[in-house]
């Protein structure tokens, strides 16, 4: 194939030069800076404070429900001991873990002696704590549509009843296997001992990853959840070591509060723990953007309009497919859009009657593409031509039409905007008439109204 000799032909080496890869440590730093920026946008410091208060009110009722469940079935006694040991040794600073677990067990024992009405109140309080956590995670993932109430009730019930049993069984089995392996083998290899010492960290990371997958009302990839889950587990371990060092070297709270020091230390630890969990959730929610190589949501003016046209084209191309339509994940991957961007566009297209969601949670075109104009898309995503200010000032509409249809020419000047000159709309304006007083043959479309 021959090429004309142009300015670019004299430097073939430059054109073929491979793009330099960014060092991995730089990429990791950018990821954490981006996650920190997202954490600031989500106001995680304030959210952690709110969750700390809610946890203090709900942890005793939750623990009472869990302990009553373990007490009702003696076969679960070993599971309970394994769960308590894990909470004390893996999720709390060693300096205060024994005191905190003693207090929590005393409170839970007293609460378990309540009447049926009191027990129902405990269950409701526990569910309120879970609902708060559910709302917080959905806010981090920018979920606008909650699960149906029966589905949420099923998830909450599973978390309250099955969650502690599964966690206790897993921890008991892990500790049992570790003890048996150490008993059968006298000289345990150092690498095996090291692996066993990391089991609590691995279980914590897997637990948080499962939480990030199950709680948000959105499809979360396991690879993203695992990154956030193990990030949370590592941060918790580092915080626990730093917190224990601070309490032993600088016993400020003990000097000031004396025997009462356990309470403020416990509150501070809950707050720091929620910060770690929320930061891990933010990392998991930001992972799709990071994989796309983008470091922010595209908030450029007009970007939703371009995204809406791309979505409509993708849904049009999917007509006739079996199963019908495309899933949100497939659309996001095909169009290189973040789920937040895509969901905002899909919800607006659904309200316009241009797209619809099937029972299989797939998106299809909900209108006749041969007779549907782009007017409602233009009005709702770019410029509402029916707003009163545009009817009162037609020069603005004409100037916008000229800018959209300039096709490489010169944009209108301020004098032309003032009415000294008029431009004829071409290009996109021919598809979507921009004069507010001139609509299609089918009549004007109000914002939010589909022409299907």
Swiss-Prot record:
Its membrane topology: Multi-pass membrane protein
First-listed, main subcellular location of the protein, grouped into a coarse class: membrane
Cellular component terms (Gene Ontology): plasma membrane
A Pfam family of this chain: Virul_fac_BrkB
UniProt keyword annotation of Transit peptide present: no
Chain segments annotated as transmembrane: 56-76, 114-134, 153-173, 195-215, 225-245, 259-279
Signal sequence annotation: none
Subcellular location: Cell inner membrane
Keywords, alphabetical: Cell inner membrane, Cell membrane, Membrane, Transmembrane, Transmembrane helix
Family the entry assigns: Belongs to the UPF0761 family.
NCBIfam families listed in its UniProt record: yihY_not_rbn
Protein name (database record): UPF0761 membrane protein Bpet3042
Organism field: Bordetella petrii (strain ATCC BAA-461 / DSM 12804 / CCUG 43448)
